[in-house]
């Protein structure tokens, strides 16, 4: 009997030792393992923009799958990204907000009423393509038109939405060209600038509507007046190229109260094969302005640091004249200038 008890005692002792060793190993592992820091939930007042963006975006009839991400500003002014896709369990956070569109517009208006930028990005032939719309001036609150412009145009091709108190950005999936359904005309909400209050006339402030298209080293910047529209064909022809050299070209069109007042074409000096041709330039000019409404056109060719040649084209009553700046006459490309003149007069 004594022997049997002794055997059981030894077995129990071994089990206790094994259990103790297991506890020691587990305790050591837990003690040495880094404790994960809990991710604090974003404050409701900071994530309101992101919640509203997703609610408004997902409410569009054209959206068949809601896979939106939105960003918000925290109290330190640092941009933070919050994943608002349905699979992440963020529905309970999103459900906290009602009247999403109005609250979002109010948030942006309160933080930055002077300027709202909408940026749309996609790819052309593997090259990144970006369109940027800068709306407003320091007398007009244009948050709601900016949101409508960005979110309602997203449709089913929108991949994500990034939003902060000054910018609304919609990332698109790959497109071959500028989306056909993208209306490049200024929204009707902005056709007539609102009064700035305090009795000022709406005509006292100039409204600029900037659209920037870029691909590789080539870009087109358009500053349109209310009601001014552009054709996408020459822009796509310019941007959808495989040009990847260090040289590039830029076209800028400026609009004012009376219409487009100046178009500048700037080409980086170097590789002639990668400069804008006269056909490309005149095609873009025709896309953004009628000759009768164009008061000045400047053509500049040169290096990044300094221009080597400049020609200014003035269009009045369908008559195009050339005004060459004296400092650059010796470097002006007469062939290109004449080609532009002939094409514009045709």
Segments from the language model and where they lie:
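Extracytoplasmic/luminal low-complexity segments enriched in Pro/Gly and acidic/polar residues
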Residues: 200-346
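Hydrophobic membrane-insertion alpha-helices, especially the h-region
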Residues: 10-29
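Sec/Tat-exported extracytoplasmic proteins
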Residues: 61, 104-108, 194, 239-243, ...
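Extracytoplasmic low-complexity, Pro/Thr/Ser/Ala/Gly-rich segments
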Residues: 30-103, 143-155, 234-246, 333-346
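Terminal targeting segments of Actinobacterial cell-envelope proteins
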Residues: 1-9
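Long, acidic/polar, low-complexity amphipathic helices and coiled-coil-like
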Residues: 77-84, 90-215
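Short beta-strand-to-loop capping motifs
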Residues: 82-88, 170-176, 222-226, 265-272
